[in-house]
Amino acid sequence: MYDNVTFHRIIDDFMIQGGDFENNDGSGGYAAQWYGYCNGQAMSDAADCDSETKYTLPDEADNGLFHLPCMVSMAKTSQPNTGGSQFFIMPDDITNHTWLNGVHTVFGQVISGCEHVTTLSQVQTDSNNRPVTPVIITSATVSEE
């Protein structure tokens, strides 16, 4: 799903964001399966959602995990339960980002190579925080270790 997807938003000392497998610009992406939400609204049945591209994830931001260096977190809109396929990774040189705790769901950690995340967080970006030179995930592997 994430092969050849770009990191479309990069902010130094904050995060690198990617996961928009539809448009590679931050405007797309959705949950891979039904979790009971359509564009952030709870629904009892997937048939009530008019499109699979509107499937979203429930917020699980109070799971005991925090926004520390090298953590992976779910990107979403400012509305509850609107996470989809987009995510962001915190570089290892971040300062205090506790304001994200309880708002965005932390669900993973970079176990090895976080210095590369930090290097990516320092690439040149335009006024919209988009990398001037595309930063692409050529291949992604999920591990449940």
Where are these regions (language model features)?
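Cyclophilin-like peptidyl-prolyl cis-trans isomerases
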Residues: 1-145
